[in-house]
Amino acid sequence: ELHEFVDCENNAAVMTWIKMGENSSLIHARNSFQETGKHWQVTFNELESGASYTMHNHVKGSETKRQDVLINFTGSDSTARVISAGTVNKDRKLDLQVICDHSTPRTTSHQRIDHVAFENGSTTFNGRIHILEHASGCNAQLKNRSLAMGSETTINAKPELEIYNDDVQCSHGSTIGQVDETQLFYMRSRGIKQKEAHSILCEGFLRETISGPLSASATSNLIPER
């Protein structure tokens, strides 16, 4: 396992290079909760035949925060999963870019990305699946959900598929929604304060993507106090 804690108070660029040999496996858990400064975090990963990689990414927006996850399948029968949960508080920004480059046969990628934006927060997600002509038998799935919880939020989502082979299984989807005012009204009518209601809804929305070995600390940092 690789546990990565990215907490940079000032402006910073953090680069992580991972090269996985044949039939290797890695669970990569990353927490990045600093909300001040401008940050750029890049992860490059190259997977040889039979390698298996899982990333559990937990992140809060900062003055400007961009994360790039670049996965290159250089060997057949390799698998990569990117599971990410993010929150953006007032006047904070988060930009997550994920590229899965399938250049060899029978490779598999799964992206599951969930973001919650609070008042005046801004979040962007761009997920790209690229399958080359000779990469037959690939399976690539992308699911992205974003929730606006407050006024004046900005949410951008752009899932992309670029496929040059017919013998593949691929799907991608992105949904953007606002917090259900009916739910809020019901909860407040039962004596639950608005701040606590927002916390409950946020925790329910991010339940599936706060995962992996650092999930306990991620929950305490990403979910607002009740």
Language model: regions and residue ranges:
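Conserved beta-strand/loop scaffold segments within soluble protein domains that form the structured core
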Residues: E1-F185, S189-I192, L206-E208, P213-R226
